[in-house]
């Protein structure tokens, strides 16, 4: 069975997400695996697939800042901090924001914060807009293996039946930079 999802098949992808499935899709540098951030079942599947502990927390990727607002608390950001974030978005920089108590622990892990990104990858923008909200996004690779950069690499690691949105990555060599939205501290070099 071929579960490649052509770029124009957003209805099929949305259906998979609504059914709490995990999908793979291209991002700025590597393929990501993602799911509905509001579904504990879907996130649990993603964590099991990645062999990733829930306490590490996850990243949300979105088409717009508006899609991220239900999951983060940006009220304490100064004008300068806000400008620093928005100068990088949309783009391949992930920021860690304070998270309100309503943000599920399956997203934040052991933290009171959440890593989020407004992407400029056109396919992911279209996917998040079609779904109407952000996606959980973590690199598409099994524990101990390098992140996938092609559909073929996703198939090799996750199997032929794993649903993959066809498309090219954005060509960046490194995964997204991660910074603290409040302090600007660099957590991961991009």
Curated annotation (Swiss-Prot):
One of its GO terms (biological process) is regulation of translational fidelity. The keyword Cytoplasm applies. Residues 7-190 form the YrdC-like domain. It holds the Pfam family Sua5_yciO_yrdC. Its main location: cytoplasm. GO terms for cellular component: cytoplasm. Keywords: ATP-binding, Cytoplasm, Nucleotide-binding, Nucleotidyltransferase, Transferase, tRNA processing. It is found in: Cytoplasm. Gene3D superfamilies: DHBP synthase. It catalyses: L-threonine + hydrogencarbonate + ATP = L-threonylcarbamoyladenylate + diphosphate + H2O. InterPro entries: DHBP_synth_RibB-like_a/b_dom, Sua5-like_dom, TC-AMP_synthase, TC-AMP_synthase_SUA5. GO terms for molecular function: ATP binding; double-stranded RNA binding; L-threonylcarbamoyladenylate synthase; tRNA binding. Its EC number is 2.7.7.87. It comes from the Bacteria. Required for the formation of a threonylcarbamoyl group on adenosine at position 37 (t(6)A37) in tRNAs that read codons beginning with adenine. Catalyzes the conversion of L-threonine, HCO(3)(-)/CO(2) and ATP to give threonylcarbamoyl-AMP (TC-AMP) as the acyladenylate intermediate, with the release of diphosphate. PANTHER family: SUA5, THREONYLCARBAMOYL-AMP SYNTHASE. Belongs to the SUA5 family. TsaC subfamily. NCBIfam families: PRK10634.1 (NF007919). This is Threonylcarbamoyl-AMP synthase. It comes from Salmonella typhi. The gene is tsaC.
